[in-house]
Amino acid sequence: MDFSSSNGSEDTELSQAQIHLYKHVYNFVSSMALKSAMELGIADVIHSHGKPITLPELATALNLRPSKIGVLHRFLRLLTHNGFFAKTTVSRGEGAEEETAYGLTPPSKLLVKSNSTCLAPIVKGALHPSSLDMWRSSKKWFLEDNEELTLFESATGESFWEFLNKETESDTLSMFQEAMAADSHMFKLALKECKHVFEGLGSLVDVAGGRGGVTKLIREAFPHVKCTVFDQPQVVANLTGDENLNFVGGDMFKSVPPADAVLLKWVLHDWNDELSLKILKNCKEAISGRGKEGKVIIIDISIDETSDDRELTELKLDYDLVMLTMFNGKEREKKEWEKLIYDAGFSSYKITPICGFKSLIEVFP
């Protein structure tokens, strides 16, 4: 652009473009400020305080030195602007000067560790160096002639699953399992919204169900359903069930235990279409003896740029790049789900939005 001949409209456009560019360049600051708040336990302190807390009170509770109060204020200013804390004023008594205090908002309540809906492990996992460092190799990855190679593999020399399973007792594996368990607690919302989906089932297999967080919620809501958690042998090896909860080790790419329904929560987006098709066909085989009563229940993202608002669409597209770069997986649009489902031999499906940004997809033989 020739600045000497630019008009007011072009100047405004340039200014807005600069703001847009800088905002996205520095979005990482908001993420890291949130990570800092989570690691310090700011939401936990405010929750324990029982009411909005002043900066000096918060600094004392966090064992911060007085010299850090100004730093804490500036972090909270950004996080308050982003909706994670609410700013108010409190008075120490009649005639006393009012002080600024900070309270929780619905998003920061998701960071309170004593809450069953705590998502702090998600924040920890998503912003862990193992998730972020790979992006330094993105240009190298783009220039490599290997369609199957993920960005994670290009950067580290191993797949994410190999990295995760190197040590069955590793801190990274525990962190990943805790993140998946935390996300599973939000499944209670789905059970409330879609209770009818699970009514009438006699048995259910939760494929790649981890430690059984989701399965236990289903059993709690439907105690008559015989539930099986199906995952890799090393995941379920030391887990014990009971009469209506069984843990089975195996390989979902080879077979899936039979049941009235098969649950795939947060599974298919980890895999490309070819491998997802193999999983779905095995799930169809697992319910084949159940007649028209059998079904597969998928909980995953369904991208809909025409109906979703901008913020929701951006979140789903962010997730899509996470799946691509870490697993060579994908988040799918409705037409992609439809093709995958029909290619696996199913006759019909129904997509129902749940839990904010996920969808529940019922698939029928």
UniProtKB/Swiss-Prot annotation:
The EC number(s) attached to this protein equal 2.1.1.46, 2.1.1.212
Q: Which residues bind S-adenosyl-L-methionine?
A: 207-210, 231-232, 251-252, 265
Biological process, per Gene Ontology: isoflavonoid phytoalexin biosynthetic process; methylation
* One Pfam short name: Dimerisation
What sort of enzyme, by top EC class, is this? transferase
The conditions that induce or repress this protein are given as:
Up-regulated by elicitor.
* Record keywords, A-Z: Methyltransferase, S-adenosyl-L-methionine, Transferase
One GO MF term: isoflavone 4'-O-methyltransferase activity
Reaction catalysis annotation: a 4'-hydroxyisoflavone + S-adenosyl-L-methionine = a 4'-methoxyisoflavone + S-adenosyl-L-homocysteine + H(+); (2R,3S)-2,4',7-trihydroxyisoflavanone + S-adenosyl-L-methionine = (2R,3S)-2,7-dihydroxy-4'-methoxyisoflavanone + S-adenosyl-L-homocysteine + H(+)
Q: Which residues form the active site?
A: 269 (proton acceptor)
Q: What does this protein do?
A: 2-hydroxyisoflavanone 4'-O-methyltransferase involved in the biosynthesis of formononetin. Can use 2,7,4'-trihydroxyisoflavanone as substrate, but not daidzein.
Similarity comment text for this entry: Belongs to the class I-like SAM-binding methyltransferase superfamily. Cation-independent O-methyltransferase family. COMT subfamily.
Put simply, this protein is called: Isoflavone 4'-O-methyltransferase
Organism annotation: Lotus japonicus
Q: What is the lineage of its organism?
A: Eukaryota, Viridiplantae, Streptophyta, Embryophyta, Tracheophyta
| Gene expressing this chain | HI4'OMT
